[in-house]
UniProtKB/Swiss-Prot annotation:
Protein's UniProt name: Myelin-oligodendrocyte glycoprotein
Keyword annotations from UniProtKB, A to Z: Cell adhesion, Disulfide bond, Glycoprotein, Immunoglobulin domain, Membrane, Signal, Transmembrane, Transmembrane helix
Annotated Gene3D superfamilies: Immunoglobulins (2.60.40.10)
Domain Ig-like V-type: 29-144
Residues carrying covalently attached carbohydrate according to the record: N59
Function per UniProt: Mediates homophilic cell-cell adhesion. Minor component of the myelin sheath. May be involved in completion and/or maintenance of the myelin sheath and in cell-cell communication.
Bilayer disposition of the protein: Multi-pass membrane protein
Family: Belongs to the immunoglobulin superfamily. BTN/MOG family.
Length: 246
């Protein structure tokens, strides 16, 4: 029995070494793909960057790197054979993406998306493929209205306060000038011994009120109209993207 084992061991040794080398090479080629651990936020019309890297870090120049959008696997950007494959992009992303490859030698890449749209909101998947081995990571993009912080109350406050302060200041200056002018005229009239009606220079209250209120209401109405127009335009853009995603 011992002689049988000793005679068969040398013949099995090459097979064991080959299997060990295969396992070692297989484990050496494995890596993990890591994306941002939180949702990335962007405003409509701006540009956004989606970072992605492999761990442990290694040169990814010869790998296939890309981003796609689930659930239909629409290609957002694809890098293969050392160059970008623009012809394989989904139509809505052509001309809007750029792969930043300055640190690809360390296994780090970033996808830049220009002119962000409402339809870009949602999930993205980044993947690295090295021959037959592939890993990927999911990330989320949230798109916000650049005027989301403006509501009618804030708009009224922004519009009314500066104009109201300006009109109060102008009104006070106007009243001071009126009183000074009336005093000078009184002195001249007394010197000339003319009759003078004290109500001649009195300005009716409704005129002063109109002088203060009209300049306030004008800009306020204009700002409200501008606010509604901007929101209708953004809403129309969003509906148009939903109707024609491609």
């Amino acid at each position: 029995m011992a002689s049988l084992l000793s005679s068969s061991l040398p013949s099995c040794l090459p097979s064991l070494l080959f299997l060990l080398l295969q396992l070692t090479s297989s484990s050496a080629g494995q890596f993990r793909v890591i994306g941002p651990g939180h949702p990335i936020r962007a405003l409509v019309g701006d540009e956004v960057e989606l970072p992605c890297r492999i761990s442990p870090g290694k040169n990814a120049t010869g790998m296939e790197v890309g981003w796609y959008r689930p659930p239909f696997s629409r290609v957002v950007h694809l890098y293969r054979n050392g160059k970008d494959q623009d012809e394989e992009q989904a139509p809505e992303y052509r001309g809007r993406t750029q792969l930043l490859k300055e640190t690809i030698g360390e296994g780090k890449v970033t996808l830049r998306i220009r002119n962000v749209r409402f339809s870009d909101e949602g999930g993205f998947t980044c993947f690295f493929r090295d021959h037959s081995y592939q890993e990927e990571a999911a990330m989320e993009l949230k798109v916000e209205d650049p005027f989301y912080w403006i509501n009618p109350g804030v708009l009224v406050l922004i519009a009314v306060l500066p104009v109201l302060l300006l009109q109060i200041t102008v009104g006070l200056v106007f009243l001071c000038l009126q009183r000074r002018l009336r005093g000078k005229l009184w002195a001249e009239i007394e010197n000339l011994h003319r009759t003078f009606d004290p109500h001649f220079l009195m300005v009716p209250c409704w005129k002063i009120t109109l002088f203060v209120i009209v300049p306030v209401l004008g800009p306020l109405v204009a700002l409200i109209i501008c606010y509604n127009w901007l929101h209708r335009r953004l809403a129309g853009q969003f509906l148009e993207e939903l109707r024609n995603p491609f």
